[in-house]
C-alpha cells in the first residue's frame, strides 16, 4: 500500500482524532486498516498527525479559556442620573444595561435589559459565566445595534423617527394611526406590517424576523405582552406615556440611542431640547412675575385651566402631578387641581360644575374635537365659563393621513415647541426663543377649526 493511500485510510478514520481532547489515542482502531508491513509508516504518520492535533487542541483550549475567563464584575450598577421615573440606564460588567418599570394598577412591572454590541457578545452572552450579579441573571440580552423592530405604540415610532430610524421599523400596531406620511404609506402597502390585536398578531410578529418588539401595557383588554413573551421574541415594555413631565418623556430617547448604537446623537437631541425648554420656561415665569408686580394681582396673570371630560356624569381628569398639569404650569397657567398628587382624578359633574364660573380655559376635552361632539355628550358644559368664552383647546391640531394624532408621535420629542404652542393658547403671547420652531401647532381652539 502506498504511503498516500495509507494517509487516506487514516483520514477516513478521523473520528478517533477527536479523542485528543481527552489526550487519548487508540492505535488498535487503526491496525485493521493497514498491513503489518505498513505499521511503521502508520506509526510515523500517527505521531505527525497526533502532534498536529495536540497542538490544535491546545490552541483551541487556550481560545476556550480566553472566552470563559472573564473577570468577575462589580455587583453594583453604575446608573446615570435621569429625570425619568420609569427607566434607568447605566453600566454593568462593561456593557450598557437598563431597568424599565411599568405601573399597572397597584402593581409595578420591572424588566431588566443587557445590551451587548458584537465585541461584548464575543465574550459570551451567558450572564452567569460573565460574572453578572444574581439579580441580573434573568435579564433580557439584546444584541445591539438593533436592525429590525416592531414599534407597537406611536410614541415609540416618534422617538425612532426623530433619530432617523424609519427604515428600522418593520411593524406597527395599526398603520392608520401613523402620522409620518412615508411610514403610513408603507403600512398601507404592507411593506411595514400592521400587527393589530387579533389572534393573528403573534403570527405576524414571529414572521418578521425581529431583533426586538417594543410594546407597552395599560392593564387593559388589548394587552398582549404576556403572549408575546411566551413566543421567546425579544420584548421591551416602554412606559414613556406614564411620565409626568415633558422632559422626562423626552429622555427616553437616550434608551433608543443605546438600542440602535447612536447614543451620542440621542444625547445631543436631548440636551438641545432640554435647553430650549428650560429657557422658554424661565422666560415665561419671569414675564409672569414682572406682570404680577405691576398689577399686584397675580391671579390675573395665571389663567385657571380645566382639563378632561364627563362620561355618564363622571368627570375624568389628569391629577395635579400629571404630564398635563406640569405642562400647564410651565406654560403659565394654574391647573384647577394642581394641589392633588394623584395621577388621575374622577369627580361628579356637579363637583366640576361648581368651578364653572372660575375656569378661564379648558384643555384636552377627551377625544372630542368639535363643539357639537362635546355638547351631544354633555349639554351642561355650555355653562362653563371657558366654554362660553370659546376658549376650549384640543391637542389634535396636527394629524396624519389617516386617524393619527401627532401629539402622541412627534410632540414627545419636541417639548419646547409644545410648551410654546400651549403658552400661546393660554397667555396669548409668548417670549421669543430663536431656536424654537413655532410652526408646530398641536393645540388648537375647537371654535376655530
Regions of interest found by a model, annotated:
Residues 96, 102-207, 212-219:
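A short, structured surface patch at a secondary-structure boundary
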Amino acid at each position: 500500500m502506498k504511503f498516500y493511500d495509507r494517509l487516506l485510510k487514516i483520514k477516513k478514520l478521523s473520528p478517533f482524532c477527536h479523542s485528543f481532547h481527552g489526550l487519548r489515542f487508540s492505535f488498535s482502531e487503526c491496525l485493521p486498516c493497514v498491513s503489518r508491513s505498513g505499521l511503521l509508516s502508520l506509526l510515523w504518520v500517527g505521531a505527525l498527525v497526533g502532534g498536529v492535533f495536540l497542538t490544535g487542541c491546545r490552541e483551541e483550549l487556550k481560545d476556550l479559556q480566553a472566552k470563559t475567563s472573564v473577570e468577575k464584575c462589580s455587583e453594583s450598577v453604575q446608573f446615570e442620573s435621569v429625570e425619568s421615573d420609569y427607566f434607568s440606564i447605566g453600566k454593568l460588567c462593561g456593557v450598557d444595561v437598563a431597568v424599565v418599570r411599568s405601573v399597572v394598577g397597584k402593581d409595578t412591572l420591572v424588566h431588566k435589559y443587557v445590551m451587548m454590541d458584537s465585541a461584548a457578545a464575543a465574550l459570551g452572552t451567558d450572564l452567569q459565566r460573565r460574572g453578572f450579579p444574581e439579580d441580573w441573571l434573568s435579564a433580557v440580552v439584546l444584541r445591539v445595534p438593533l436592525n429590525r423592530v416592531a414599534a407597537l405604540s406611536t410614541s415609540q415610532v416618534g422617538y425612532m423617527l426623530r433619530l432617523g430610524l424609519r427604515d428600522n421599523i418593520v411593524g406597527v400596531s395599526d398603520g392608520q394611526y401613523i402620522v409620518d406620511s412615508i411610514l403610513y404609506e408603507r403600512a398601507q402597502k404592507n411593506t411595514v406590517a400592521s400587527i393589530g390585536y387579533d389572534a393573528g398578531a403573534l403570527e405576524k410578529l414571529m414572521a418578521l424576523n425581529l431583533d426586538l418588539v417594543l410594546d407597552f401595557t395599560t392593564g387593559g383588554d388589548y394587552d398582549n405582552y404576556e403572549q408575546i413573551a411566551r413566543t421567546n421574541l425579544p420584548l421591551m415594555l416602554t412606559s414613556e406615556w406614564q411620565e409626568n413631565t415633558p422632559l422626562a418623556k423626552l429622555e427616553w430617547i437616550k434608551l433608543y440611542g443605546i438600542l440602535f448604537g447612536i447614543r451620542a446623537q440621542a444625547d445631543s437631541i436631548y440636551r438641545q431640547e432640554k435647553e430650549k425648554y428650560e429657557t422658554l420656561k424661565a422666560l415665561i415665569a419671569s414675564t409672569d412675575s414682572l406682570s404680577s408686580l405691576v398689577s399686584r394681582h397675580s391671579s390675573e396673570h395665571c389663567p385657571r385651566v380645566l382639563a378632561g371630560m364627563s362620561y355618564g356624569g363622571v368627570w375624568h381628569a389628569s391629577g395635579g402631578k400629571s404630564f398635563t398639569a406640569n405642562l400647564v404650569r410651565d406654560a403659565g397657567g394654574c391647573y384647577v387641581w394642581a394641589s392633588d398628587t394623584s395621577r388621575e382624578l374622577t369627580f361628579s359633574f356637579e363637583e366640576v360644575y361648581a368651578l364653572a364660573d372660575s375656569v378661564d380655559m379648558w384643555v384636552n376635552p377627551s377625544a372630542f374635537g368639535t363643539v357639537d361632539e362635546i355638547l351631544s355628550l354633555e349639554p351642561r358644559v355650555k355653562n362653563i365659563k371657558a366654554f362660553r368664552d370659546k376658549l376650549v383647546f384640543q391637542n389634535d391640531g396636527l394629524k396624519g393621513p389617516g386617524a393619527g394624532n401627532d401629539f402622541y408621535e412627534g410632540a414627545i420629542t419636541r417639548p419646547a415647541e409644545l410648551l410654546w404652542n400651549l403658552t400661546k393658547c393660554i397667555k396669548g403671547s409668548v417670549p421669543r426663543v430663536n431656536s424654537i420652531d413655532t410652526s408646530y401647532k398641536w393645540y388648537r381652539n375647537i371654535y376655530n377649526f
